[in-house]
Amino acid sequence: MLDPKLVRTQPQEVAARLATRGFQLDVARIEALEEQRKSVQTRTEQLQAERNARSKAIGQAKQRGEDIAPLLADVDRMGSELEEGKRQLDAIQGELDAMLLGIPNLPHESVPVGADEDANVEVRRWGTPKTFDFEVKDHVALGERHGWLDFETAAKLSGARFALMRGPIARLHRALAQFMINLHTAEHGYEEAYTPYLVQAPALQGTGQLPKFEEDLFKIGRDGEADLYLIPTAEVSLTNIVSGQILDAKQLPLKFVAHTPCFRSEAGASGRDTRGMIRQHQFDKVEMVQIVDPATSYEALEGLTANAERVLQLLELPYRVLALCTGDMGFGATKTYDLEVWVPSQDKYREISSCSNCGDFQARRMQARYRNPETGKPELVHTLNGSGLAVGRTLVAVLENYQQADGSIRVPEVLKPYMAGIEVIG
């Protein structure tokens, strides 16, 4: 959530920055609500002062033996007007809050300005895509060869956009997740967490999925119980660990990592990536989250991105890093880098990680704060998140980049300890 004071007092400036994201702020409505709020607030304060004066006058009139009935009537009338003023203020604030929940984050000044992915800026590349001397197969053909990747049975069980993995491919999938978790905890300083896969609505509101993106979520409800949602990413549960807290500055940065399944309806992805594991309703991801001092958050974003890159480097998978433009960033991000891995069968790079600094946007929604040692006052933390990595898409990249002419798959060197020394599958 944006700073309400900033939106109320500088709506034109905020609107101009949001316009670079393709978001149109209803400035006229905000200004009208602000005028109403000021008017009602002023009248309420005047009434409260008058009521206090009348109450004092009642005591003095009693001492003089005067008739206090008119004064009591005035106090009652003012009390009713004050209650009405409070109702009006609550209604105005409620509408402002609802508007604020639907407004995306402001882009950082360093973010490229553009309407869509065509305006994203390539920052760097690592590795060179391999040249194959045989016809490249996609991961579906490679996985279905021995029945180890089975979309037909998955569809029978659950419908479209699900995968059933068996045998060596299931083991390779598990090996990737274990490798990622071990790397981030042992070398990058993250604390491993095991989180619930079901969360309540306030957690999703805290990280920005609700109320705007409810159609992308899977909801579970029982009569008489609060609705629960399957997490679309462990970002939700990890970031909300600090919801409602005031942290000691010495605790920062907090760095969490978790391996979880993620669940997404893919409501806006009809017809896209219908073949294979690129876009699934259920997929595993290793998620990194950092809670940091605001002064260090953009430096932390570079480090977080490097942590995700290290996974690809150790797997020896060619990739590139993109700085997303204003029009392509996620709702809560103020700056984002995407990592795209080389997928030989598609002859292009595909997203495998998104690393974002959300500034104080999520922290304000969650009321996650730290005590500033210089002022002694609570201030909002900054939150960051990034995939380290999406396990299914990493599996796709490994299968395709490590394939051999006979359809077998070489096991990447760093994964061999997790595969009991197996060097080739298939």
Swiss-Prot record:
**Presence of the UniProt keyword NADP in the record:** no
Q: Which Gene3D superfamilies match?
A: Bira Bifunctional Protein, Domain 2 (3.30.930.10), Serine-tRNA synthetase, tRNA binding domain (1.10.287.40)
SUPFAM superfamilies to which the protein is assigned, alphabetical: Class II aaRS and biotin synthetases (SSF55681), tRNA-binding arm (SSF46589)
Task: Write out the GO biological process terms.
Answer: selenocysteine biosynthetic process; seryl-tRNA aminoacylation
Tell me which residues bind L-serine. 233-235, 287, 387
Alphabetized PROSITE patterns for the sequence:
AA_TRNA_LIGASE_II
EC main group: ligase
Keyword terms: Aminoacyl-tRNA synthetase, ATP-binding, Cytoplasm, Ligase, Nucleotide-binding, Protein biosynthesis
Write down a Pfam family by its short name: Seryl_tRNA_N
GO CC terms for this protein? cytoplasm
GO molecular function term, any single one: ATP binding
Q: Where in the cell is it found?
A: Cytoplasm
What Enzyme Commission number(s) does the record list for this chain? 6.1.1.11
Q: Does the keyword Cytoplasm apply?
A: yes
UniProt catalytic activity:
tRNA(Ser) + L-serine + ATP = L-seryl-tRNA(Ser) + AMP + diphosphate + H(+); tRNA(Sec) + L-serine + ATP = L-seryl-tRNA(Sec) + AMP + diphosphate + H(+)
- Pathway(s) served: Aminoacyl-tRNA biosynthesis; selenocysteinyl-tRNA(Sec) biosynthesis; L-seryl-tRNA(Sec) from L-serine and tRNA(Sec): step 1/1
Q: Where does ATP bind?
A: 264-266, 351-354
What's the domain remark here? Answer: Consists of two distinct domains, a catalytic core and a N-terminal extension that is involved in tRNA binding.
Assembly mode: Homodimer. The tRNA molecule binds across the dimer.
* Task performed by this protein: Catalyzes the attachment of serine to tRNA(Ser). Is also able to aminoacylate tRNA(Sec) with serine, to form the misacylated tRNA L-seryl-tRNA(Sec), which will be further converted into selenocysteinyl-tRNA(Sec).
Recorded family membership: Belongs to the class-II aminoacyl-tRNA synthetase family. Type-1 seryl-tRNA synthetase subfamily.
- Identify the PANTHER family for this entry: SERINE--TRNA LIGASE (PTHR43697:SF1), SERYL-TRNA SYNTHETASE (PTHR43697)
Q: What protein am I looking at?
A: Serine--tRNA ligase
Gene symbol here is serS
